[in-house]
Amino acid sequence: MYLFFDTETTGLPRNWKAPVTDLNNWPRLVQLAFLYYDEKGNKINGSNFIIKPDGFKISTEVSKIHRITNERALSEGVPLKSVLDNFKNILSQSKYLVAHNMSFDEKIIGAEFLRINMTNGLNGKKKICTMEQSTNYCKLEGPYGYKWPKLSELHYKLFKTVFEESHNAEVDINVTAKCFWELKKINVL
């Protein structure tokens, strides 16, 4: 069983190499979307949550990127513990975790588990990063060889259609899943 997930946050970390336990370094979770698929690629279910801010605010600058304002999150948001309980329930049934930029998303979720004293359910799972594992397939030149493809670049390489990254976890995770199953079909994964 495959669990695809994506996050939107209050910003970026100050130090990308900091451990997940450095809670002051890792931004807060604003949106979590996830999809659960069987081994054959059939979607079983999915969820999308906006997190109710508790102890943090969503800046105007960041809300321009993902369109989730502090006011919207306060009115529509769900408490973090409820969201993580729901996620952890699906996580416990999953064999593989899939994300585009796994190292970022797993640290965001891991830090939130720690903030509310929950066991990090991501540990011990097999992880597949569509960004890292499609680098040689996409062959996009960067300053030090091939660069990691953006989700939109991977989508274009696979389907020859433009996808504007939405910075909406629900939209992005559906595109990630579409790309993943195509990468499996053509034996890149």
PLM region spans:
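Extreme N-terminal starter segment of soluble prokaryotic enzymes
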Residues: M1-L3
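Short acidic, Gly/Ser-rich segments with clustered Asp/Glu that frequently serve as metal-coordination loops
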Residues: T7-N15, V20
